[in-house]
Regions:
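Concave beta-strand-loop units of leucine-rich repeat
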Residues: 1, 8-23, 27-43, 50-64, ...
Length: 109
């Protein structure tokens, strides 16, 4: 499996994709998604547009170079450690309580 498209899955609330060999993951427009656990993949793309209910995102050791969570306004916990991120777009996340972005190539937030 190289790609997984879950775009528009209106009822999806929880996703566990740990250790799946994915290159792309499309989670756009999943309005009820609250938790997503993705790890050990070799992602080039992670699309999170249109996920206002996402509270917890763990995308560790995926090889991501960029990540945009600016549209995830309910996010309380984000762990994106162990990637190759040079760009992390967080925007305004008023509920964010925990952020782990260690072991990346970030110059600034």
């Amino acid at each position: 499996m190289s790609g997984l498209v879950l775009e528009g899955m209106a009822g999806l609330e929880y996703l566990d994709c740990l250790s799946l060999p994915l290159d792309t993951l499309d989670l756009s427009e999943c309005p009820r998604l609250r938790e997503a656990y993705i790890g050990g993949a070799r992602l080039t793309t992670l699309d999170l547009r249109g996920n206002p209910s996402l509270e917890r995102l763990f995308c560790t050791d995926c090889g991501l170079r960029s990540l945009d969570v600016s549209g995830c306004s309910a996010l309380t916990a984000l762990n994106c450690s162990g990637n190759r991120l040079s760009s992390l777009t967080v925007g305004r996340l008023p509920a964010l309580e925990a952020l782990n972005c260690s072991f990346n190539d970030l110059a600034s937030l």
